[in-house]
Amino acid sequence: MKVYSCFICFDMKNNKRSLFILKCLMEQSDEKHLVTIANINEYLRQYDLDANRETISDCIKELQEVGYDILCVRSTQNQYCMRERSFSLAEVKLLVDAVQSSRFIPEEQSIELISKLAELVGSHKGEILKRQLYIESRAKTDNPDIMEYVDKIHQAIIENKKIKFRYFEYNANKEKVLRYDGFTYTLSPCVLVWNNDMYYVVGIYKDKEGYSKFRIDRMCDFELTEEKGTESQESLDMSDFFEKEFSMMNGETCEVELLCENKLMGSIVDKFGIDVNTEIVDAEHFKAIVDVNLSGNFYGWVFASKGKMKILTPEWVKSEFQEIVNSYAK
């Protein structure tokens, strides 16, 4: 039996019955699907509870008095529904889409999590969400322990404890191979980061200066230790670490002038923000002056434009990009 967290704050005189009436309204009603007292009584019988019309009506009034938005449509047989919820259908749909598209969450756990999210809007709207469900398992991770690892890492951060784990990669045969012959890492985790559809833990590794990051879906043999974690080094700039590690990676920072076709303005704004420095060149082109980390990611991003974006300055960056392009023709 699932019990909603909001039940904890209740101190109703007829306790159990009132709680299950609320549960019935949350699960089985919405503005388009109202329930009668007979429906509610039928629901109560599933839990070996029973009540007459007057008792159920009194319980609903008490629920309304403590703030639940329960609509009553009066007729010869009154009908009720839970009108307002903590999350709207659109809000839950956004959360469902995020879970659905996340490569980090395994397929089986994605379906389970989406089912729980669907309960937030009641059974009728929840079924609509489930019918629209599409999980592309090909792109999902196959590590079933991720949720447990996330929970333990979060606990380690709160309690300032170290974690231990081994880390795997894939060989040419697509087989999992432990890094460094099964070496066990010990990390003082500082923060969990979701970036580019992957989940990372960032922390302090041994006596290494600065922060280190590890993909959680590549961990195995995970252990939450009782060892006190290393205090976060205040002199280190975590925002600078994020900028270098999670943007265009660890290249040299440089101001670059790009010539772009107008249709790429959306991509430029997405990458650099609405305040990016741009200038109209002609009816079909604009220039963008941006600060980037010169790395394979940046050059790959320019290359992916298929000639619709060109590097104008500096000349040495332009030449370096051309050398990369020429290397593909060899």
Residue ranges of model-derived segments:
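Short, basic/aromatic recognition patches that contact phosphate-bearing ligands
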Residues: 1-98, 180, 327-330
